[in-house]
């Protein structure tokens, strides 16, 4: 677990938010909105494992920055769905590209073929764990 925490910290340091109008909390929520499409604030809070009130604050910041927009759920007009704006999508893409470029370079420069295979297998296992319902 410590290794995953260290790698996450390294990825963040390789893609600093200094020139971006968001925090890491904003960016992770925005990334999930881009990946999942329109989502309610409650669903997003559950997925991010934060309180609904905390997510409301995060969404307010994203909304103020023009990175998300609200719309009604076509199947249930009482629900408000949050979607990424084109600016929000571009921000996620730019941030992800920077981190992915660093990681790809590090993998190709530091790992041999066997280590690369092991890493791919470990990623599959971590995906399975992340998707677990328990």
Residue ranges and their predicted role:
Residues 4, 26, 48, 59, ...:
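Short amphipathic alpha-helical/adjacent loop interface patches that line ligand
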Residues 56-57, 120:
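Conserved catalytic core of two-component sensor histidine kinases
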Residues 31-35, 96, 124:
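Short, locally clustered residues in the helix-turn-helix/winged-helix DNA-binding domain
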Residues 11-54, 65, 81:
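N-terminal helix-turn-helix DNA-binding core of bacterial DNA-binding proteins
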Residues 60-117:
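Charged, amphipathic alpha-helical coiled-coil/dimerization segments
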Residues 113-134:
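C-terminal regulatory/oligomerization modules of transcriptional regulators
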